[in-house]
Amino acid sequence: MKLLLLALPMLVLLPQVIPAYSGEKKCWNRSGHCRKQCKDGEAVKDTCKNLRACCVPSNEDHRQVPTTSPTPLSDSTPGSIDDILTVRFTTDYFEVSSKKDMVEESEAGWGTQTSLPDVHHSS
């Protein structure tokens, strides 16, 4: 049991001490490593995640090969005519007025010439 308790911290600290065990990510077409700082004889070619630099050995000419090729369009035949659709937007609007506005208009002479009937309230 004591041996297990001693081995566990060693396995946890081992990746931080030995770079080969740290699981550094490969970058730049698998020819470089993501590190905080590049070693002597390495050049920074790109940036990796977590603000790390992609360190590539500087004595070789490394060119990154694109991993994907352009995808051709399925309907890209020469001479095809594209349909153009024009949509015109129309706005429908309504005027809202109250009875008070109608009374004021009729008094000003702009509305109809009929007067409103008198209303008598009985109690």
UniProtKB/Swiss-Prot annotation:
Annotated Pfam families: Defensin_beta_2
Transmembrane helix in keyword set: no
Domain of life: Eukaryota
PTM field: The three-dimensional structure formed by the three intramolecular disulfide bridges is indispensable for antimicrobial activity.
Propiece residues: 64-123
Signal sequence region: 1-19
Cysteines joined through disulfide linkages: 27-54, 34-48, 38-55
Molecular function in Gene Ontology: lipopolysaccharide binding
Compositionally biased intervals (Low complexity): 66-79
Chief location category: secreted
Location in or out of the cell: Secreted
GO cellular component, one term: extracellular region
DNA repair listed as a keyword: no
Sequence segments annotated as region (Disordered): 59-79, 102-123
One BP term from GO: negative regulation of cell adhesion
Role of this protein: Host defense peptide that exhibits antimicrobial activity against both Gram-negative bacteria, such as E.coli and S.typhimurium, and Gram-positive bacteria, such as S.aureus and B.subtilis. Inhibits cell adhesion of E.coli on intestinal epithelial enterocytes. Causes rapid permeabilization of both the outer and inner membrane of E.coli, leading to morphological alterations on the bacterial surface. Binds to bacterial lipopolysaccharides (LPS) with high affinity, and may thereby be involved in immunoregulation through LPS neutralization.
Protein name per Swiss-Prot or TrEMBL: Defensin beta 118
Lineage: Eukaryota, Metazoa, Chordata, Craniata, Vertebrata
Gene: DEFB118
